[in-house]
UniProtKB/Swiss-Prot annotation:
Organism: Staphylococcus haemolyticus (strain JCSC1435)
BP GO terms, sorted: translation
Keyword rRNA-binding: yes
GO molecular function, one term: rRNA binding
GO annotations of cellular component type: ribonucleoprotein complex; ribosome
Gene that this sequence comes from: rplI
Source superkingdom: Bacteria
Keywords: Ribonucleoprotein, Ribosomal protein, RNA-binding, rRNA-binding
Pfam families: Ribosomal_L9_C (PF03948), Ribosomal_L9_N (PF01281)
Lineage: Bacteria, Bacillati, Bacillota, Bacilli, Bacillales
Name recorded for this polypeptide: Large ribosomal subunit protein bL9
Length: 148
């Protein structure tokens, strides 16, 4: 019997997959527990529509990420930090501080965990910080570190 999985079933199939399974297993376990539905023409059409909708949503996410990337390339974020003698920073500028400055200065909200800055910024001046906006889209934020 052909079924369409509505949820992931370990060792059998993933959500949205169409598979041929034994009739008893399909009726007594998969369909009964709402893990799958029978692969009728109506259900197949519904699955196709869901896949198209999901693809359109995914494309919209990618387009939004690309728009944000182009916006980030045009702006500059200014972060102030305490410095000692010789222009050395006390501590470092973290991704949290950059995210907060981006939110207050340009009203753009980006999760600090999406920024790739493992060591932080330890010097005054300009730094390009890579940001993972989406699985496929990566941008950079230009950060200007100034004295407090």
């Amino acid at each position: 019997m052909k079924v369409i999985f509505t949820q992931d079933v370990k060792g059998k199939g993933k959500k949205g997959e169409i598979k041929d399974v034994p009739v008893g297993y399909a009726n007594n376990f998969l369909i009964k527990n709402n893990y799958a539905v029978e692969a009728t023409p109506g259900n197949l059409k519904q699955l196709e529509q869901q896949n198209k909708r999901a693809e359109a949503d995914r494309q919209k996410e990618i387009d939004d990420a690309k728009a944000l990337k182009s916006k980030l390339e045009e702006i500059e974020v200014e972060v102030s930090a305490k410095t000692g003698e010789g222009g050395k920073l006390f501590g470092s500028v973290s991704t949290k501080q950059i995210a907060e400055a981006l939110k207050t200065q340009h009203d753009i909200k980006i999760d600090k965990r999406k920024m790739d800055l493992p060591q932080g910024i330890h010097a005054l001046g300009y730094t390009n910080v890579p940001v993972k906006l989406d699985k496929e889209v990566e941008g950079t934020i230009r950060v200007h570190t100034v004295e407090k």
